[in-house]
Curated annotation (Swiss-Prot):
The gene is COX16. It comes from the Eukaryota. Its main location: mitochondrion. It is found in: Mitochondrion inner membrane. GO terms for biological process: mitochondrial cytochrome c oxidase assembly. This is Cytochrome c oxidase assembly protein COX16, mitochondrial.
């Protein structure tokens, strides 16, 4: 058996012996119908591998979803250790500065007084 380029040269007896082997019969079938004996098994193996590996990829994405899942507002509040109860009315007054946290009383240390405008800043419809 000698090599000339990329083809193998076999003598008559060697070729007959090769044709009787599994590889020889397969090469002959591939030459007759290459899609049926080469392309189709390749595509089937790709699809079967995808279906077989689907379990592993689903586990991978489930772990990813567990790690990066969006938490709802109540779930976030449950994660906080030193949480206080939420009361809309008290929080509104506390944020406005009207309620002292330590005494829970309304602060009466100021009055709301309207600042006098300059004459030229008065609305036009009031001028006569």
């Amino acid at each position: 058996m000698s090599y000339s380029g990329n083809r193998v040269f076999r003598g008559k007896k060697e070729q007959e012996a090769y044709d009787k082997t599994l590889a020889g019969r397969y090469v002959k079938l591939v030459k007759k119908n290459h899609f049926l004996f080469f392309g189709l098994p390749f595509l089937v193996s790709i699809v079967a591998g995808s279906i077989y590996l689907q379990k592993f990829t689903s586990v991978k994405w489930e772990k990813y979803d567990e790690k990066y899942q969006q938490l709802g507002e109540e779930e976030m509040l449950n994660l906080i250790e030193n949480k206080r109860t939420v009361d809309k009315k008290n929080d509104y007054y506390r944020l406005q500065g009207l309620l002292n946290d330590h005494t829970n009383q309304v602060a009466d240390d100021y009055e709301i007084v309207r600042v006098q405008r300059r004459k030229e800043d008065e609305p036009v419809w009031d001028r006569q």
